[in-house]
Amino acid sequence: MRWLFWSSGSQQAPNSNKDNNNNNDGDDDNNNIIINNINRRPPLTLECPSPSHPPCASCSTKATTSPSNPKRGWNTSLTARDWAGEFKDPRNLIPTLLLTGGILFCVRIHRQYLRRIPLATNISPTYFHKRSLFGRVTSVGDGDNFRMYHTPGGRLAGWEWLPFRRVPRVKKELKDRTIHIRLAGIDAPELPHFGRPAQPYSHAAHTWLTNYLLNKRVRAFPYRQDQYGRVVATVYVRRFPWIFLRRDVGLQMLRAGMATVYEAKSGVEFGGEGKESKYRRAEEMAKRRGRGLWKGWKGAGWESPREYKNRMAGVEGERAAAGGGGGGVGGMGELGVNGGKN
């Protein structure tokens, strides 16, 4: 019997060990399942037992890290960064300074060199005797004045070849968009206006200036404005085949005998004493050769543009005194800078 007891016990022992091993394996599986479930759970947030509970580490952690915290401020992430250090970082500071400086430089260049001036009355006094105006001649009104469409920067700024940088050709589109320029230092014969008859060679002078300047690109150096809204300026043009040489338009008119040096007691602009002497030498040369209006200038009845203006002013003054009422208009021609209005 004892042998049977111990034998049966010895036979069951392996089975019991096997069962124990199976139970241990089952426990391990259950532990793994529990651990996996714990890992899948969202992080625990500990709450204080009551509002009067003093702040603790867990509460602080919850207040700063819990995404569902309704008391979290919108600027928490902003104040958490060291922005002073970020701004002082050369990797951020240098590009910012370069970008800001580049924008300010472009604005300055545009204001000084690329901003278009529509009318002579819009020209800043800082231009006079210091700056120049570049543009295309759109019309010639008389033998010594014309209108120019300002094209700052020329072709380098896109004028004449970019679609939005075209010079208008229609007279309606040019209204109030051109600069009225009076050639400095010269006086051309007067066309008929204000009821005055045309002066000899006035049409010839107008035709000469039209052929010389119309639709050409010119550069004007302004000196001042007159009372008619025109700007008195020395004008240069480049003409084929000598496109690399600038030609003084006023000087060329004097050489061709189509104008005289402007004579007045005050208000004359030449652009310097050297230019005035050059103008007078050119006039003297044309006078000796009898060019243009100087043909027969020694004969009776010949008069210069200045003498013509003075004579017309006297005639209109006599009419005004006699009650004709024509002196008011006639006086405009005498008061103009560098001659009459036209």
Swiss-Prot record:
Region (Disordered): 1-75, 319-342
UniProtKB keywords: Calcium, Endonuclease, Hydrolase, Membrane, Metal-binding, Mitochondrion, Nuclease, Transmembrane, Transmembrane helix
Coiled-coil positions: none
Comp. bias (Polar residues): 61-75
Ranges of compositional bias, category Low complexity: 15-24
Annotated residues for binding of Ca(2+): 187
Main location: mitochondrion
Protein name: Probable endonuclease LCL3
Organism: Paracoccidioides brasiliensis (strain Pb03)
Gene designation: LCL3
